[in-house]
Amino acid sequence: MRMYDRWILKLLAVFVVAACAVIQGQSAPRQRIDPALATLGGGFVSDSAQVNGTTLHYVRGGTGSAVILVHGFPEDWYEYHRVMPLLAKQFTVVAVDLRGIGGSAETAGGYDAANMAEDVHQLVEHLHLEHVYLVGHDIGGMVAYAFARRYPETSRGVMMLDAPVPGIGPWDAVKSNPFIWHINFQQTPDLPEQLIAGREAIYLRHFLDRDTFSDADVARYARAYAAPEHLRAALEIYRAFPANEKFNAAERDQPVSGAGSRRKLAFRETHAKLRRSVTGSRVCKRQD
């Protein structure tokens, strides 16, 4: 699903304003220093934590109330690199790589949103953070929603960016939308791994707008998914969508903010459903 930097900047600016108002088996990941840290202008560190039977990589900086940033597909934590220095002026910012993606370790299973929300929750506890704000884009929005469902006492609020929620709103329409064909494709057993392997940059470029993402950006994201185990992990997230549908049934009282394009009917209907089913939720719409 396409995402535009200016769109994200504007939405996170809205999020900051809203937050201010409220305030007033696995294998070990490859250890590396991410050169992308240099783009953040200092004050950020890259680290990892053993949580929920896996190892999560994250980038942290700033001080103040905590904002957890959860990326979508086909990105990793770097998706938020432009806004992280801005948020760090007022918040503790933690951008995490989802289980099996980028610098995080892959596992045999556990890729449903509820379990990955537990990953994030244990990371929050590991970092001794309290009452966090969660921002999730795309599949990260599904994790953020599950986090709010499971841990209302830990989350002050959740913001979902262009995130359809399995089982909520017009999910059947989302799955049958030809412009979102990759959902069904990536749920297919085994075949996507064989077709995408070695062609990661070509495949990911399809989802990343050429006016926004340079070839260098695409190459970076391709590296985050290039290892066979990381590609498989990304696909397993999609294969876990049926489990997410079963989880996303009950009404919750945790405030949730949804943001999406006026052009994207499925997202608009999803957010309308969220407004009805989640007490305290609100929806922001951007002008295209």
Stretches found by the model and what they are:
Residues 2-12:
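Bacterial N-terminal signal peptides that target proteins for export
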Residues 10-21:
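Bacterial N-terminal signal peptides
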Residues 28-48, 53-56, 61-66, 94, ...:
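Flexible "cap/lid" subdomain of the alpha/beta-hydrolase fold that forms the substrate-access gate
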Residues 69-72, 95:
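Structural cue for short, hydrophobic secondary-structure segments
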Residues 74-82, 93:
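Serine-hydrolase catalytic-loop signature spanning alpha/beta hydrolases and amidase-signature enzymes
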Residues 82-91, 126:
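A short, Lys/Arg-enriched amphipathic alpha-helix followed by its capping loop at the start of a domain
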